Amino acid sequence: MALRAKAEVCMAVPWLSLQRAQALGTRAARVPRTVLPFEAMPRRPGNRWLRLLQIWREQGYEDLHLEVHQTFQELGPIFRYDLGGAGMVCVMLPEDVEKLQQVDSLHPHRMSLEPWVAYRQHRGHKCGVFLLNGPEWRFNRLRLNPEVLSPNAVQRFLPMVDAVARDFSQALKKKVLQNARGSLTLDVQPSIFHYTIEASNLALFGERLGLVGHSPSSASLNFLHALEVMFKSTVQLMFMPRSLSRWTSPKVWKEHFEAWDCIFQYGDNCIQKIYQELAFSRPQQYTSIVAELLLNAELSPDAIKANSMELTAGSVDTTVFPLLMTLFELARNPNVQQALRQESLAAAASISEHPQKATTELPLLRAALKETLRLYPVGLFLERVASSDLVLQNYHIPAGTLVRVFLYSLGRNPALFPRPERYNPQRWLDIRGSGRNFYHVPFGFGMRQCLGRRLAEAEMLLLLHHVLKHLQVETLTQEDIKMVYSFILRPSMFPLLTFRAIN
């Protein structure tokens, strides 16, 4: 309860004062020349074991972002944080992200997600690049990048995402026009959840699920339910060692394994179907990411399945919540919304003919997505296990130390972003070409950046483009939405939005 009370106080006060933020943003320029030892680094106060016990008891750490943000205000831009038997270094400045990338090895190392790894080990499944480390990670990653992350790959799968985004927009517009008032107020979260799964599934496997504007099959609904159960059980299990949780939470482990069984079975069916089609005849045109990976034959079918399952799981909530928060911010910032609408309408004909042009002809909309991820980073932190000794904020960091970059605090630092509480996409266009390469890193950095980032960006960009062309988004809620950490940073609740047809 003490942790929650402290977090509520933190919510009530303004974000970093300008004076304190300037100190955080410029401290590196005033540090003494002699590098300080690791032991001299400020340490977050509190008993490491009591803190861990409270997390276990509450099955989560909802206010982690607020407590870490408060600690940066109190201790400065770097501190040590001990939790149970583990320790880490927390940082929040772009310069430290750059230094971490500079010392990346050929195999940048990060911590694994134990519930996901435990399932794969128990069932004998391979791990994908999200869970792998070492040479096997690099082998997989180098063969996945050309078909998933490269500009050429984006050009090929983007029209498929565009088709789903158009269907979503048309279905929503139809519902709005069916209302005599020409408007519709609803909880849009389930619809956007369906959209992201539909778009990802089409790009990955070349198959529609019928979740957007159609009647989904029972198999699609089972797959959808399995994803929901998997995410919920992940949060319940991720903070406790399996050696303990297997006795305290056997029912949750059972649900977690059964959900993954359903997800992998679905992936098996999709891949087998593609494999049979390829054996019959080679397609004359692009059909899906997985089909290209199978044709290339540089990865085994099991490795392709493992990575496609990670892409499927990783492309849902991480896309849904930025879309929801962007719609919310546009609803309470109508001037920004109108500027984006004008941009989309001006580019509509060009994008309709060549959907790939959405990546170049919607700069303000792309900036709006950056602004959303600055304020509401889905991944709360980035992490690296230091592969060699380095110096951060004039402190020696030994090799093997876990370092976490907290994006919530980075994005709300007034020394980096004037008036950080303000939703202002234009700020990203104003700083283009200014050398601020590490101000926007919600998808990670270097070789370990998110493999599915281009797919996620395309899904968000195209949905907003098509919706804003036809519909005005409104809300009665002007207050900030409380965010909670639950494996990802997500809204604790989401207000109803009103969509109104535009003449």
Curated annotation (Swiss-Prot):
Outcome of substituting T318M: In AH4; abolishes steroid 11-beta-hydroxylase activity
Variant or mutagenesis effect after changing R332G: In AH4; high reduction of steroid 11-beta-monooxygenase activity
GO molecular function, one term: iron ion binding
EC number: 1.14.15.4
Record annotation: effect of changing P42L: In AH4; classic; highly decreases steroid 11-beta-hydroxylase activity
Annotated effect of mutating T196A: In AH4; decreases steroid 11-beta-hydroxylase activity
Record organism: Homo sapiens (Human)
UniProt lineage: Eukaryota, Metazoa, Chordata, Craniata, Vertebrata
Result of altering V441G: In AH4; abolishes steroid 11-beta-hydroxylase activity
UniProt-reported outcome of changing L83S: In AH4; highly decreases steroid 11-beta-hydroxylase activity
UniProt effect for mutating R453Q: In AH4; abolishes steroid 11-beta-hydroxylase activity
Pathway: Steroid biosynthesis; glucocorticoid biosynthesis; Steroid hormone biosynthesis
Keyword Lipid biosynthesis part of the UniProt annotation: yes
Family: Belongs to the cytochrome P450 family.
Impact when changing E371G: In AH4; abolishes steroid 11-beta-hydroxylase activity
A Pfam cross-reference name: p450
Effect of R143W: In AH4; non-classic; highly decreases steroid 11-beta-hydroxylase activity
Mutagenesis or variant effect for H125R: In AH4; slightly decreases steroid 11-beta-hydroxylase activity
The protein's name in its UniProt record: Cytochrome P450 11B1, mitochondrial
Effect the entry attributes to changing R374Q: In AH4; abolishes steroid 11-beta-hydroxylase activity
Protein's GO biological process: aldosterone biosynthetic process; C21-steroid hormone biosynthetic process; cellular response to hormone stimulus; cellular response to peptide hormone stimulus; cellular response to potassium ion; cholesterol metabolic process; cortisol biosynthetic process; cortisol metabolic process
GO cellular component, one term: mitochondrion
UniProt membrane topology term: Peripheral membrane protein
